[in-house]
Swiss-Prot record:
Region (4 X 5 AA tandem repeats of G-Y-G-G-L): 11-30
Lineage: superkingdom: Eukaryota
Record GO biological process: chorion-containing eggshell formation
Protein name: Chorion class B protein B.L1
Any single GO CC term annotated in Swiss-Prot or TrEMBL for this entry: egg chorion
């Protein structure tokens, strides 16, 4: 049955953030909180890469021959056919990339190395107001426990 009184009774799960308002009888008190009866199994997630945007051929005509692409491509290669094929004949995609040896031939300079790294420092959940003042507990220390 939920998390009971939470973090100290008056803060996160007691009378402040989770008392009689947001979490007393719901989020952290007697409701769905983090009780064992409400824990489900794993959440399956399926992801897919974004569609390539560098080369596109869309037509109702017939294309024969080769298409040459030179440069740095973000994907190893994709090909797709959309539309309807006639009831007679064949339709296919033949895709080739070099000699089959795939490797990274160029890497950028700094990438993600240099940049702002505030993370959890002084913002929403760090040492600042966070959940503490107003939304969570009476005084708060940033984590919502109240004091």
């Amino acid at each position: 049955i939920g998390c009971g009184r939470g973090c100290g009774g008056r803060g996160y799960g007691g009378l402040g953030y989770g008392g009689l308002g947001y979490g007393g009888l719901g989020y952290g008190g007697l409701g769905g909180g983090c009780g064992r009866g409400f824990s489900g199994g794993g959440l399956p997630v399926a992801t897919a890469s974004a569609a390539p945007t560098g080369l596109g051929i869309a037509s109702e005509n017939r294309y024969e021959g080769t298409v040459g692409v030179c440069g740095n491509l973000p994907f190893l290669g994709t090909a797709a056919v959309a539309g309807e094929f006639p009831t007679v004949g064949i339709g296919e995609i033949l895709y080739g990339c070099g000699n089959g040896a795939v490797g990274i031939t160029r890497e950028g300079g700094l990438g993600y190395g240099a940049g702002y790294g505030g993370g959890y420092g002084l913002g929403y959940g760090g040492y600042g107001g966070g959940y503490g003042l107003g939304y969570g507990g009476y005084g708060g220390c940033g984590c919502g426990c109240g004091y």
